[in-house]
Amino acid sequence: MSVSKKDVEYVAELARLSFSEEQKEGFMEDLNSILGYVDKLSELDTDNVDIIVNPYYIENKFREDEVEESMDLKDVIKNAPKNLEEYIVVPKIID
């Protein structure tokens, strides 16, 4: 499997990025190099290799949710730069 210029353009379009032709060629070469390395790794025989386990036990540290008193709505609205009744108005960020 190889990455074509069209693939690079498609991913750039999805990410809403624009690149020069030279940059597209560079990305295409880099991605093809990475995929070549992955292909080499897939050729390795790992049937007789022991499973590697992380020696450190990692555990999520969760805390109990505790209800705390929050600011009064009037104070929140008073500190907001712009409001519409009980709502804070923010700039639109998504088209």
Swiss-Prot record:
Pfam families from the UniProt entry: GatC
Entry annotated with the keyword ATP-binding: yes
Function: Allows the formation of correctly charged Asn-tRNA(Asn) or Gln-tRNA(Gln) through the transamidation of misacylated Asp-tRNA(Asn) or Glu-tRNA(Gln) in organisms which lack either or both of asparaginyl-tRNA or glutaminyl-tRNA synthetases. The reaction takes place in the presence of glutamine and ATP through an activated phospho-Asp-tRNA(Asn) or phospho-Glu-tRNA(Gln).
GO molecular function: asparaginyl-tRNA synthase (glutamine-hydrolyzing) activity; ATP binding; glutaminyl-tRNA synthase (glutamine-hydrolyzing) activity
Catalytically driven reaction(s): L-glutamyl-tRNA(Gln) + L-glutamine + ATP + H2O = L-glutaminyl-tRNA(Gln) + L-glutamate + ADP + phosphate + H(+); L-aspartyl-tRNA(Asn) + L-glutamine + ATP + H2O = L-asparaginyl-tRNA(Asn) + L-glutamate + ADP + phosphate + 2 H(+)
The organism's place on the tree of life at top rank: Bacteria
Family of this protein: Belongs to the GatC family.
HAMAP family (alphabetical): GatC
Name of this protein: Glutamyl-tRNA(Gln) amidotransferase subunit C 1
EC id: 6.3.5.-
Subunit structure: Heterotrimer of A, B and C subunits.
InterPro entries per UniProt: Asp/Glu-ADT_sf_sub_c (IPR036113), GatC (IPR003837)
Keyword vocabulary terms for this entry: ATP-binding, Ligase, Nucleotide-binding, Protein biosynthesis
PANTHER family named among the record's database cross-references: GLUTAMYL-TRNA(GLN) AMIDOTRANSFERASE SUBUNIT C, MITOCHONDRIAL (PTHR15004:SF0)
GO terms classed as biological process: glutaminyl-tRNAGln biosynthesis via transamidation; regulation of translational fidelity; translation
Leading EC class: ligase
